[in-house]
Amino acid sequence: MAVQQVKKSRSKRDMRRSHDSLTGPTLSTDKSTGELHLRHHVSPNGFYKGKKVVDTKSED
């Protein structure tokens, strides 16, 4: 079994762990509706970069 030669200090341990935190998804505001969506993804209404790229069912 591996055993450390010198004990790591709390500071060194915590500095190593400083990059382990998770970040939330990056969101953008849709130009046409003002709705939030994931960046580089088509919004739920079928728009991408201000252009209609996917036909969606109408709610009528």
UniProtKB/Swiss-Prot annotation:
Q: Where is this region: Disordered?
A: 1-60
Keywords, comma-separated and alphabetical:
Ribonucleoprotein, Ribosomal protein
Per its UniProt entry, which superkingdom is the organism in?
Bacteria
What are the annotated GO cellular component locations?
large ribosomal subunit
GO biological process terms, alphabetically, are: translation
Query: A single Gene Ontology molecular function, please?
Result: structural constituent of ribosome
- A Pfam family annotated for this chain is Ribosomal_L32p
Task: Indicate, by first and last residue, each region the UniProt record lists as having compositional bias (Basic residues).
Answer: 7-16
InterPro entries xref list: Ribosomal_bL32, Ribosomal_bL32_bact, Ribosomal_zn-bd
HAMAP family documented for this protein: Ribosomal_bL32 (MF_00340)
Which family does the entry's similarity section mention? Belongs to the bacterial ribosomal protein bL32 family.
Protein name (Swiss-Prot/TrEMBL): Large ribosomal subunit protein bL32
